[in-house]
């Protein structure tokens, strides 16, 4: 899909189709009023006749509107003007793209970016339109022998902005939106891959491929032999039951003018399949445990967006690749593991494995002398129970970092909700035999998991994002969502100090 931005009057557009909004009840937007005046009341007459109410998502395609150069005009219902918010705007864009494709439009000029969306500027409206369009067109059919013929003739979409001085803002929004969309697409492609293809080595290969196309990015890997030398016994224990080698992929991006600038470190849990190990999961829905690498998929997606935008910032990303399988070599409930930090962990349940991988990685990243560390993981079912599918769980003992991430979530629409990690919750992890257990019980499960991780992050500012409820959808629309790529990327854009809106 090709995107561009322009500033012009609707009646002068020679595009195959122009897209304008109509409010409820049958009220013309400013642009629609211009068209109505030029067409001598043609559009308002249709509305009075009841052809379109203006309810959100309603569509009416007009052909050969009098005195308008464009062949077609698509009227889009936008609901009540004062109630148009981010969620409704995205839904309208999605429905518009679907209608343009279904009606055979090859190109269109979209004036919906001139609508007033509460609290949002031109940059946000254009960028969100790009991301929403790209996400609505995504499909994963690489492994189907007979690929369906989806009708998608739309090739070019032009967004109109009110004034010429906003053209630069619009172009920047398209650039950023395309980068985030590319990152989300990579995240979804990697996460949707079946576990017989997407194993830790596959994750590493995807990162290496990215490194070959970016001068700023260097990719290395740490295998099991090197992990053993480093004392990463907890990480190694989780992967011991699998024939697929555990591989930690290290991606170092150096974009800052000052190469000595401390890096931001992103860590992604990369359990490419989680059977639960000896504490075997129920069979129903176990196929979705290929998505237990959703954290790593989100991190590699954010790195893709970072490379595409060439942000002036230093970032280290760790993809903690591993597979949790039952076998005679697998680790067991009752085992006591000595982590890379020297702290010991009593294993109560082998299905609480993500934290055992992450704790060693959180110790490993100390060598980068990080500015801060953000880990993201499909860590707990408890987070899904607490927050559902809409918000990711955010945990941090550092208020400024937590607020930065929450703001990035609000800006990008990839929202998170902060939960506490008070000292009282640490008591749930006490063990009579080791420094801690790997399971805090059913109450506050997402919180106690974050408390466990916090014990390995004393040397830097840290935040944990639990994406167990947001990284993928189940049911008929099963598949990766591409989250938390928008949140992480927005956080990096803000950190880099890159100009965005007006």
UniProtKB/Swiss-Prot annotation:
Main location as per UniProt: cytoplasm
Subcellular location: Cytoplasm
Signal peptide extent: none
Gene Ontology BP term (one): proteolysis
Binding site for Mn(2+) 2: 269, 274, 292, 353
InterPro entries per UniProt: Leucine_aapep/pepB (IPR011356), Macro_dom-like (IPR043472), Peptidase_M17_C (IPR000819), Peptidase_M17_leu_NH2_pept (IPR023042), Peptidase_M17_N (IPR008283)
Residue ranges of the TM segments: none
Keywords from the named record: Aminopeptidase, Cytoplasm, Hydrolase, Manganese, Metal-binding, Protease
CDD domains: Peptidase_M17
Catalysis performed (reactions): Release of an N-terminal amino acid, Xaa-|-Yaa-, in which Xaa is preferably Leu, but may be other amino acids including Pro although not Arg or Lys, and Yaa may be Pro. Amino acid amides and methyl esters are also readily hydrolyzed, but rates on arylamides are exceedingly low; Release of an N-terminal amino acid, preferentially leucine, but not glutamic or aspartic acids
Ribonucleoprotein found in the keyword field: no
Binding site for Mn(2+) 1: 274, 351, 353
GO cellular component: cytoplasm
Cofactor, how bound (note): Binds 2 manganese ions per subunit.
Cofactor: Mn(2+)
GO molecular function, one term: manganese ion binding
Active site positions: 281, 355
Keyword Ribosomal protein: no
EC number(s) reported in the record: 3.4.11.1, 3.4.11.10
UniProt xrefs under PANTHER family: CYTOSOL AMINOPEPTIDASE, LEUCINE AMINOPEPTIDASE-RELATED
The family this protein is said to belong to: Belongs to the peptidase M17 family.
Chain's role: Presumably involved in the processing and regular turnover of intracellular proteins. Catalyzes the removal of unsubstituted N-terminal amino acids from various peptides.
NCBIfam families registered for this protein in UniProt: PRK00913.1-1, PRK00913.1-4
Listed name of the protein: Probable cytosol aminopeptidase
